[in-house]
Amino acid sequence: MKARSTIYWLLSFGILYFLGMLLPLMENDSAQFAVMASRMVIENDFTHLYKGSLPYLDKPHLHYWLAAISMKLFGIHAFSYRLPGVLLLFVGAYFVFKTTKLLYDERTAFFSGLVFIASQTIILAGFDLRTDAVLTGLVAWAIYHLARYIYDEKLNQLLWGALVAGFAFATKGLISIVVIGGVVLALLNAKQKWGLLFRVSTLGALLVFLFSLTPVLYAYFIQFDLHPELVVRGVSNRSGIKFLFWEQSFERLSGEGHGKTGNDPFFFFHTFLWAFMPFSLVGIVGLYKTFRSKFSEVLVLKNLTIALLLLLGLMSLAQFKLPHYLNVLLPLITLVFTPAVLRLVDQKIGKPLSIITFVIYGIASVLICIPFYDYAALGVFLGLVILSWMLHRRRVSMVSWLLSGVLVFNLLAFTVFYPKLLDYQSDISFSKRLNLQDAELVNAMHKHTWNLDFFFQTHLPERSIDELVDSHEIYVLVDIDTYQRLKLLRPDAVEYASALHYRVTKLSLKFLVPKTRSSTLEVRRVIWLP
């Protein structure tokens, strides 16, 4: 792939990411993390982390610090919350390009950065932004410097790699070091440079790594180690430092404190099939053909592939796992599969596979219009037919088929599907209609209200129904159960606003089908107590 065409595609995907950054935040995680970061700005407290009114001991501070700095510079809104994460995704794409150029060749390198930024899971990570966006970018960054050190043996590359690896650790803990370490071990084995591990410079790198963690260690010590009386997930006397270095990752492996999401040993393997779209199908076939022909001759690719399989297997052992946990492996996945994808460009099987992928995205593009704009589905279908005809007439490469499919689908997602879907987050609806200068709003549902907290830049006070019996001139947020109880105790309560609510991150077929959607919705209300 040529540099000029790569730039055009990157600009197209840059516009796509920008559109996603303008949308409201999704609950729970994105909105929750935005509230946690904005609280740092509002209270000018960058040391303590809180989830609502409770001390937060889960993911370390760096993601929240970056978001808070962005909000301090550009204001408290969804765009500024997403900005550091999206920028680091593009930084990650750049360092994937640099690493691929180091390991393979320039042609593969230009394509690799595009493969990374156009992967379906990375696009979603830039919109439904959690800690994984920052983590993935930093992991790609650290891998490049450490790979350069293995190839060139320059001390500055080792120290840069250790510093950035520390930042990755300060974002989500031990998993970052496991992934970075897996790549480093694979390259050490490929180049037979195991002696690098036993140099004095390795000790210096360890010191730099620990130095980069000092802000997080200090914050954890202040919030938790000095306050053993704090209770987190039912346990007191929690050490933040011990949690960071040991407990966090092993709690997820065992499911302790987080619950269990299933024992499917192939969870991340089948998650990969959609997460690495539009390149998963052609990548698997390409890697298979590489394996059949000269796999044993390509030592770097061989070792990276083994490292990827081992890391996937290790992550699959966890009792608590979610699809976006795969994101941290995307830099390595890109390094493994980009040469395999390019291998098919000049082969007969490559273009049919890319057209099949385009058709899959085309069908998905039509389907996401149906739930909210069924009349537009026909127009989208006709547009895709015309686009297919144009691509066929111009005899474009398989790469253009792949990138066109993912670009069209996600443009429709960010301009058609998600804007309507997010209307079913009642907090967003209420935030447009309430004026808290008139009176206080309290939460009687005992459910999180992250988007309202973010919009009004405060944690809504929680009140029980019994506490509200004698309250006056106050707004109360209720669901159907608390509404009925409140009306019995306060017949004078007046409905101020109502909105339909759905947990939009857990889509179901019943919700997506317009005729059955009403059965999946709950009604939430804002009540005025005179």
Regions inferred by a protein language model and the residue ranges of each:
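Specific aromatic-rich, kink-prone transmembrane helix
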Residues: F95, L135-Y151, I333-V336
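Transmembrane-helix signature of polytopic, membrane-embedded enzymes
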Residues: A3-W9, V96-A118
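Membrane-embedded architecture of ER/inner-membrane glycosylation machinery
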Residues: L159, L253, K289-P530
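Membrane-interface transmembrane helices that cradle and orient dolichyl/undecaprenyl
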Residues: K101-R107, A142-W160, A168, V341-V345
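Transmembrane-helix motifs of polytopic, lipid-linked glycan transferases
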Residues: L83-L103, W141
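Extracytosolic helix-loop segments that constitute the early lumenal/periplasmic catalytic or substrate-binding loops
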Residues: G14-L16, Q32-P55, L62-W65, I69, ...
